[in-house]
């Protein structure tokens, strides 16, 4: 059995908690894209973990973790995360890392910051974790992979060549990477040939974990305000390096909508309305701490994300955040260039889209009639079944419907 869990919005949908909940029925959770810009918060009854690079797996069962070739790795961050994991759980994760994964180095973070500064008001609003530049170096064929660390002479020769390129192209000095080498030594026992990753995926029940959300995908997201990775479900095969059949596509969305950084957001709520949602949902980034932009659920956009991702079932999170609100707004169409449309053919249209809302009655809690009417309204619009909801921050607070 192979399944994938992914976000249907601009990230921050609660995928980490949902992945952890579902992982109890699988042997391994596989991260196939992204880097330390992800921030998957997983809260148990007695402790909380924030996964940036480690896959989100249920720690109270013998579930393993795989980081595949599609991920760009900040080695120092991963070491810190593993130590934090050990201090909270009392054990180390059963972790395998593909030696084909590329490494985020200090000069990638410098370039990330420099690019944002140069763009000025057109900046994407990245986390400045070096993700985009690391992927760019991969495409430029000057990236460093974990396998490069095995031969120190060749490794230093590559770093020397990269230093020349970065100095000439970007006027950026490549710093000492001794800390990166130290981190590599600590992780070495987890790094395996990619053939071993393929065997593990082929021979076990696998849950693939995406990062960010479909609307941040480098190809089908709200470009250029996207991440550097293929975080859509279409990224699985590239991210693990071989064709793999996935049966279940589990899309996660919030009962409302948030976004970090710049880019179009038709249903963004401003003033007191937006601030109330932000406070209720504690909407601040797990990676950057930045306040998230907040707004109402956008059904045309959700339907678009379902279409491009192939979602077969849905999980709705944070419905409890809206408990007690008298009225809930939901976007059901847009006005674009004077025309009313209930679907988008291109994310470019979002820049000029004016939301058209329906207003529904609020609810007291997830057992209320009005809450179930909200779920039914969404299902009827997007033509997919909501199979689970979460009613609180903990893994144990996910309910199967």
UniProtKB/Swiss-Prot annotation:
It is found in: Cytoplasm. GTP binds at residues 11-17, 39-41, 292, 318-320, 390-392. Binds 1 Mg(2+) ion per subunit. One of its GO terms (biological process) is IMP metabolic process. Mg(2+) binds at residues 12, 39. Keywords: Cytoplasm, GTP-binding, Ligase, Magnesium, Metal-binding, Nucleotide-binding, Purine biosynthesis. CDD domains: AdSS. Substrate binds at residues 286-292. One of its GO terms (cellular component) is cytoplasm. Its cofactor is Mg(2+). InterPro entries: Adenylosuccin_syn_GTP-bd, Adenylosuccin_syn_Lys_AS, Adenylosuccinate_synth_dom1, Adenylosuccinate_synth_dom2, Adenylosuccinate_synth_dom3, Adenylosuccinate_synthetase, P-loop_NTPase. The active site is at residues 12, 40. It holds the Pfam family Adenylsucc_synt. Gene3D superfamilies: Adenylosuccinate Synthetase, subunit A, domain 1, Adenylosuccinate Synthetase, subunit A, domain 2, Adenylosuccinate Synthetase, subunit A, domain 3. One of its GO terms (molecular function) is adenylosuccinate synthase activity. It catalyses: IMP + L-aspartate + GTP = N(6)-(1,2-dicarboxyethyl)-AMP + GDP + phosphate + 2 H(+). IMP binds at residues 12-15, 37-40, 127, 141, 212, 227, 290. NCBIfam families: PRK01117.1 (NF002223), PRK13783.1 (NF010355), purA (TIGR00184). Plays an important role in the de novo pathway of purine nucleotide biosynthesis. Catalyzes the first committed step in the biosynthesis of AMP from IMP. This is Adenylosuccinate synthetase. It comes from Thermosipho africanus (strain TCF52B). The lineage of its organism: Bacteria, Thermotogati, Thermotogota, Thermotogae, Thermotogales.
């Amino acid at each position: 059995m192979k399944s994938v869990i992914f976000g249907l919005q601009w990230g921050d949908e609660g995928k980490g908690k949902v992945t952890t909940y579902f992982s109890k029925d699988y042997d391994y959770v596989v991260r196939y894209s992204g880097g330390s810009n992800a921030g998957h918060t997983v809260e148990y009854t007695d402790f909380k973990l924030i996964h940036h690079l480690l896959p989100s797996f249920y720690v109270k069962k013998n579930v393993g973790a795989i980081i595949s070739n599609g991920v760009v790795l900040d080695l120092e961050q991963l070491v810190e995360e593993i130590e934090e994991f050990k201090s909270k759980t009392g054990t180390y994760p059963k972790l395998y890392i593909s030696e084909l994964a590329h490494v985020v180095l200090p000069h990638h973070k410098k370039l990330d910051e420099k690019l944002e500064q140069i763009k000025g008001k057109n900046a994407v609003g990245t986390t400045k974790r070096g993700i985009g530049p690391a992927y760019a170096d991969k495409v430029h064929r000057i990236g460093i992979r974990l396998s490069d660390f095995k031969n120190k002479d060749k490794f230093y020769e590559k770093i020397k060549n990269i230093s020349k390129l970065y100095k000439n192209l970007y006027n950026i000095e490549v710093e000492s990477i001794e800390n990166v080498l130290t981190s590599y030594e600590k992780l070495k026992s987890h790094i395996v040939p990619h053939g071993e990753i393929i065997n593990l995926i082929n021979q076990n029940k696998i849950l693939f974990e995406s990062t960010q959300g479909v609307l941040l995908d480098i190809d089908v997201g709200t470009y250029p305000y996207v991440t550097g990775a293929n975080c859509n479900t279409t990224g699985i095969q590239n991210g693990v390096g071989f064709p793999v059949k996935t049966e279940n596509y589990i899309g996660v969305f919030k009962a409302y909508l948030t976004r970090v950084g710049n880019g179009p957001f038709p249903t963004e709520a401003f003033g007191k309305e937006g601030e109330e949602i932000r406070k209720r949902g504690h909407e601040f980034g797990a990676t950057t701490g930045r306040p998230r932009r907040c707004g109402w659920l956008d059904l045309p956009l959700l339907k678009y994300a379902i279409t491009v991702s192939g979602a077969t079932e849905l999980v709705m999170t944070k419905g409890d955040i809206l408990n007690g609100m008298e009225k809930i707004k939901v976007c059901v169409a847009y006005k674009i260039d004077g025309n009313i449309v209930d679907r988008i053919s291109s994310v470019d249209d979002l820049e000029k889209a004016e939301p058209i809302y329906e207003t529904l009655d609020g609810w007291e809690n997830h057992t209320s009639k009005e809450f179930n009417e909200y779920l039914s309204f969404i299902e009827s619009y997007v033509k997919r079944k909501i199979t689970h909801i979460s009613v609180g921050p903990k893994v144990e607070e996910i309910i199967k419907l």
